[in-house]
Amino acid sequence: MLAWFALLAVAITARSEEPGHDADRSIYKAPRAAEPPRVDGVGDDLAWDRAAWRELKYRWLGPELESSDFQGRYKVTWTPERIYLLLEFVDDILIDTHRDPLQRYWDDDTLEVFIDEDHSGGNHQFNHNAFAYHFALDNQAIDIGTDQRPRSYSHHVESRWQQNADNIVWEVSIDIYTDDYRDDVDTNRPVTLYAGKLMGFMVAYCDNDGSDIREHFIGSEFAAGDHKDRGWIDAGLFGTLQLVE
């Protein structure tokens, strides 16, 4: 009996130490696309009609924003091969001053998409428990590798955007990989997606209107406390992406 209680205590302790998620995370139900949308920065495909818009409304860094300076929203659809995002932004000034895609990419205007394939939460700073794709205006996608250095993961994605005055339409598609992904091999294969699958998911935007560093960081999830810029480290901040028919 004492041995049983000891095992129970160990199990309870293990559960309490498992990585989790912050309270009050959002859930986005993404409908399956009968035909995949074209990733062309237009956003007029039928695949988008059933997907709901979700705002980027949580200011993680920077002072109060005027609506003329920035507005953002997104929607998501999927096929068994990958997920697709359609994003619409109002941004009066676009900045891309760091020509080396691996240098200070977060201080330019940058779209960020965070994905935790198995919805496990937890740390992903220097591992692939989750991916934090930083999409630059040149459509490259950067994250930090297991060697603790920025790497291009542009081969995981397709990205296109178009601008009309201050309005930007941005479309991306993303292959989904497990946390077994290895940077040192070329045999990684994306998972096959299915209705009912849950993933950790979050969208954010770095806005720079001409400063040396980004002036605002706006996300799709509420971040409590003083350290709001932690999505690149902690997948517990992510919301939930639920794939539905």
List each language-model region with its residue ranges:
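Hydrophobic h-region of N-terminal signal peptides that target proteins for export
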Residues: W4-R15
